[in-house]
A protein has these predicted regions:
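Catalytic-domain carbohydrate-binding cleft regions of carbohydrate-active enzymes
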Residues: 1-139, 144-145
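Accessory, solvent-exposed terminal regions and/or long lumenal/extracellular loops of proteins
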Residues: 139-257
């Protein structure tokens, strides 16, 4: 279970092993904690595909890094220089893998220079402190940097099962933020010839306004129109891997739009 949790936040998710069974049905059945805990992370990985795919493009396009030591983004915080058990998954998610058995608490350092939202509880924490996070076997400590814009896709069994015509866009308030949604044909190298599109999102925290810029680029099969369900994350919005409650739905056909939350 702990490995599956860690693997969920690796650039390429794999169920590693050689001679031992690795498929989740070898560890029980639905309704049993070991199966359910692994299925939870697999479903989360699929829902995070818009974030992961867009971040992969950013890494490739801008010569970036997917799994980032904290010091890369928070060099001014000297404590991050010594943190070796946490990493940033893209620029928004801080992950602290649990690497010892039978523990009930796990120490997590939140870098100074940002506030952080607990992904599972929506509890907001100030940066620059160490927390002892309760960690049941089903929970991996994950924190979202304030100002992050996270796109979530539908629950699927494989990556191309459903299109992204109704993405859930989560805003984690507390700072201004940007995110660029990247899309292409999914199954070839035509993006190297310019066959892709990007949509830039900007969050103005003081004005509580999300701006969706005009779409740039195109590719065969691109969605001409779609909907975004925009959710301002808080204590009553829902948490974790489940679809968020409330929010506002906005129709988008490639032209600039703005929504106040």
């Amino acid at each position: 279970v702990r490995w599956m949790q860690f693997g969920t936040f690796c650039p390429m998710m794999r169920s590693h092993g050689t001679e031992l069974p690795r498929e989740i049905w070898n560890f029980g059945k639905r309704g049993e904690w070991c199966f359910d805990a692994q299925e939870k992370m697999i479903n989360l990985r699929y829902r995070l595909l818009p974030y992961i795919y867009s971040t992969s493009w950013d890494v490739s396009h801008n010569d970036g890094t997917f799994m980032r030591p904290l010091v890369m983004d928070f060099a001014a915080d000297s404590k991050t220089h010594e943190v070796g058990g946490e990493f940033l998954f893209g620029r928004s998610l801080l992950v602290a893998p649990v690497t010892r058995p039978e523990v009930t608490e796990w120490s997590v350092y939140l870098p100074q220079g940002a506030d952080w939202w607990d992904f599972w509880s929506n509890e907001k924490q100030q940066g620059g402190q160490t927390l002892n996070r309760c960690v049941s076997k089903e929970i991996l400590p994950v924190y979202v940097k304030a100002g992050s814009i996270l796109p979530f896709g539908p629950k699927v069994q494989y990556s191309a099962e459903k299109n992204w015509d109704n993405l859930e866009i989560r805003i984690y308030p507390g700072a201004d933020g940007t995110f660029t949604l990247y899309e292409d044909e999914n199954d070839n190298y035509n993006y190297e010839k310019g066959a892709y599109s990007t949509i830039r999102f900007h969050w103005d925290d003081k004005a509580r306004r999300l701006t969706i810029e005009e779409r740039e680029g195109s590719f065969p099969g691109m969605l001409k129109s779609r909907k975004f369900k925009v959710v301002l994350v808080g204590q009553n919005s829902g948490t974790g891997d489940r679809p968020m409650k409330g929010g506002k739905t906005i129709s988008y056909a490639g032209k600039k739009k703005s929504i106040k939350l």
